Amino acid sequence: MHLQRLKEELERDIARIAEFKPVVHHITNYVAMNDSANITIAIGASPIMSFAHGEIDELVSIASSLLINIGTLDEYIIQAVMLAVKSAKSKGVPVLLDPVGSGATKLRTSTALSVAEEGVDVIKGNQGEILSLLRKEGVVRGVDSKVTAEAADVKEVARKFGLVVVATGKEDLISDGRSVYVMRNGTEMLGRITASGCMLGSVIASFMAVQKDFLLASLEGLACYNVAGELAAEKSSGTASFRSNLIDEISKITAEKVIERLNLERVV
């Protein structure tokens, strides 16, 4: 993707999020809920954090995108997730799945696969979580991963489920099943705070609310988040200040800041 086109689209979509304040319905984990809500507000969207079965269909009806995060699972949450995804699919609401810990336990892996097969538009996870969706074995410890995915693996997951995949790691891989991009931005500080991956999902879901090319929306969200992370790290003295500065930088992000630092390459 040409950087000039990405800059133009990013300028437009940041402005559209600010103008329309789209509702992003989150069914997410307890650990990340506060941070996810705050980062969604910072980018300009409007978060709803609810998993009550009785109101899911109504909330999906007013949402512009749906984020599913399986970080803290139980049977009630699993039922809420499936209800929400089915409702979103029937209403044309785009869905992002964050398969937290998939590959670490059978429950997480089976839930992630069930949601993916139900029909979502973007899957965002670390590279071990993404590989688990191919039933490939790796080393996934809780929400952490020591697995490195190849471009071909990420492309295969995207083609298998017919969606966009964002596989995070030292280098982030993004694929729609045809092309594969590698993004070399971000900071190691993102790996030192809880909910950093969950917040990334919220930012991407916010772009999905206004940009229906989900490969582009994923690139936009990932680029904004990683560059904001770099900017935050430069002014932070530790992990607590980094978390606050990350949200600050997302609230001030511009296309110019992103393109100035962006290291993006199409590899397939």
UniProtKB/Swiss-Prot annotation:
Pathway membership: Cofactor biosynthesis; thiamine diphosphate biosynthesis; 4-methyl-5-(2-phosphoethyl)-thiazole from 5-(2-hydroxyethyl)-4-methylthiazole: step 1/1
**Which SUPFAM superfamilies does this UniProt record tie to the protein?**
Ribokinase-like
GO terms (molecular function) for this protein are: ATP binding; hydroxyethylthiazole kinase activity; magnesium ion binding
* GO biological process annotation, one example: thiamine diphosphate biosynthetic process
Supply the EC number(s). Answer: 2.7.1.50
Is Transferase among this UniProt entry's keywords?
yes
**Which residues of this UniProt protein bind ATP?**
124, 168
Q: What does it catalyze? A: 5-(2-hydroxyethyl)-4-methylthiazole + ATP = 4-methyl-5-(2-phosphooxyethyl)-thiazole + ADP + H(+)
Q: Which Gene3D superfamilies match?
A: 3.40.1190.20
Which of this chain's residues are annotated to bind substrate?
Answer: 49, 195
Q: What class of enzyme is it?
A: transferase
> Which Pfam family is an annotated match for this chain, by its short name?
HK
What top-level branch of life does the organism fall under? Archaea
- Report the cofactors: Mg(2+)
Q: Which UniProt keywords apply?
A: ATP-binding, Kinase, Magnesium, Metal-binding, Nucleotide-binding, Thiamine biosynthesis, Transferase
NCBIfam families, A to Z: PRK09355.1, thiM
What protein am I looking at?
Answer: Hydroxyethylthiazole kinase
The coding gene here is thiM
